């Protein structure tokens, strides 16, 4: 009724007690997601509406982690700052305090030194201890009275912001209501895509205009062709999609929620998949349990289902069930579930359930302490999953354009998004000062020989390192008056300095005006410094003809200036050498039977080590033909840590596994072949 969500809670059968109940003596917790690029606009709106003295952002307590503990303890003990920094940087995101001794030895420290022994002793003591106050990601407190009369306030480092010096737990203790003003990059991307589609169709196009059950979209999702799609673009989600095979909106709700630490730790994922594939019979001990778990085949996946089980099967009141929900997230920190154990077991056994079933339900509830997902959140996220998937499927050019303009967000870099779009027959045009705006744009194809129904994507000046928004605005405004004659004319009329002109030349954005990159760099270097003295004098000197760089050098220059290339993939140039090494491409692996020994190589684009994966690292490799997923078991991670962490070009010897659309290499040996890339700098994104 407020119009802030597209999800109908009644139609979706969402549990109202999850939001509010009679026994809850406090207002509900409210989270509202906004476009990440407009979040500051919303924050300033709140300050303007309620006043700086009645609205402020909550604090969060930043605690010591291993790296920060090493650096601060090292300073206190008088250790060399640079060596301490190197030690801290050598730690992987998964390293524990128990790994410090080995890292010390690797970085040239003497583990037996009294000072180093003191360092080793103090790190676990300091770990988890409060270090400083930081700003909450979006927790706003709005009060009727002046906040300074209730809580301590300080000015934030960022202009026009004020911070409460208490965290969310402190605020809850005094009964202050917090509203989370959160930023979601996909909202920016979707809004931008809809704007582009509306402009192209010359008619408004809204989320509501997207068909509800599009078979092509679900086909794409089931094949895990979801790079860039909200929530289901991670390795774990892409691995789950061909197994779960979503064919409806509610399937997407389950998909969003099931690949979470809660269901994984609670041993809910595999039983659900077996039942979905009709490999296991679905049985319910009672009609009450069936009413709560029927939609998820007898497996509790959502927080609301745990609350319903507590109410229907264990005799909890709505308020007690909500207290159980609150305790689930805190049980590891505060032991909050122990008081509920007896009540759950006794309540269920007194109603005829076996103690074994009751204990299993309690263990699954404990699993939700590892971040189980509310069905209401999953439903809202599933809508964004479907919308973004539909846009990627049917409007890939507009979707790519919007994604590039919404970065940074998600799992993938601009280069990876572009490579994926090209595999979907989207043509990307280079940055060009004669046509590019600040943002990337879409252009209708004027080449009638092309059969694609999609427009081209023109890269914007925002892709060029060293060019800011103000410089781009000056370029566009000057271009509106008359076309640029040459780079010097551009520099004069757009008031560009030497660094900005060099950035444009390095990115090949001046190609239309003065030829290839080397030629343009020479023109800029030889003439730009003279322009202030001889601004109105005609340039009579003829530039010498300079040979264009080789393709490999051009690709390296592209990555250095924009972190992407529209030329051939770097591995296309290396393919003859890789073939001599008997290394398979990604597309060749697709034709192999499961269980075959394979060897492949690719640029490392992503490393993931989920906390629920028992030390397993998932690596994504990219070559000119596609993507290869690699699974590295913990034993090999420990043995070849350096190759996993430092390789830009990683060669994997292993076993090919293929089950339907689920395909990956189980690594047996890793080799770092980064030297083959020379000075090419490629971006890898690491998640945990």
Question: What do the predicted segments below correspond to?
Answer:
Residues 1-688:
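Noncatalytic, beta-rich nucleic-acid-contacting surfaces in large DNA/RNA-processing enzymes
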